[in-house]
Amino acid sequence: PLEQCLSEASQAGFIGIESGGKFPKKSEELIPKLNEFNLHLCSGWYGANLRTNSVDEEKNIIQDQLKLFKNCNSPCMVFAEVSGSIQGDPNRKLSTRPQMDLEESKKYYEKISEMGKYLEDEGMPLAYHHHMGTIIETEEDTVRLLENTHESVKLTLDTGHMLFAQGNSLKFIKEFSERLIHMHCKDCLLY
């Protein structure tokens, strides 16, 4: 239950928490619930379909979450591309994840740059989440994204996903610190 999640986060000493599926979607319900446990909304997942949607379509789709996050004074939005993703599908091998050719990559970087600028103008920085089973999974994918997008496209560094993809989280902390605005610190067992 939501109350147990919030209570345990607060008891563990956290002051912020990301939104999840159990969280109210309206700020007038969410803010009092967070206040009850002395927590703030530090971000939350937005699953984008920018590969298949136009930027204008994605801007329209993101509005409810953008409004919620702004009302809750969230510092950023964790943004991940989910179109074609294999995450959560136990019948698909990791090797079948979606990948982009050079032409699609260029178009995607332009679109994600436009979304980054839009969200920055809205006061809600886009914190791109590299993720297993998606188009931006590996260290190389993530470096290309950062090197080919506008500086408004920031990074959520997820240490578990980076390790699972055989990447180096320290590299991003050292080389891309100006783009790093959110982190997911995780352990990952590799067998």
Kindly give the residue locations of the regions a language model identified:
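Active-site acidic/histidine proton-transfer and metal-coordination neighborhood
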Residues: 56-157, 164
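Active-site beta-loop-alpha junctions enriched in small/polar residues
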Residues: 20-22, 46-51, 82-84, 131-133, ...
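Aromatic-lined glycan-binding groove of carbohydrate-active enzymes
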Residues: 168-191
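A short acidic, amphipathic alpha-helical/loop segment
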Residues: 29-33, 141, 168-175
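N-terminal pre-domain/capping segments
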Residues: 1-75, 110, 114, 120-124, ...
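Short, compositionally biased strand/turn segments
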Residues: 1-4, 156-157, 162-166
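Short, flexible, glycine/charge-rich loop motifs used to bind or transfer phosphoryl groups or to couple energy/partner
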Residues: 7, 67, 144-146, 171-174
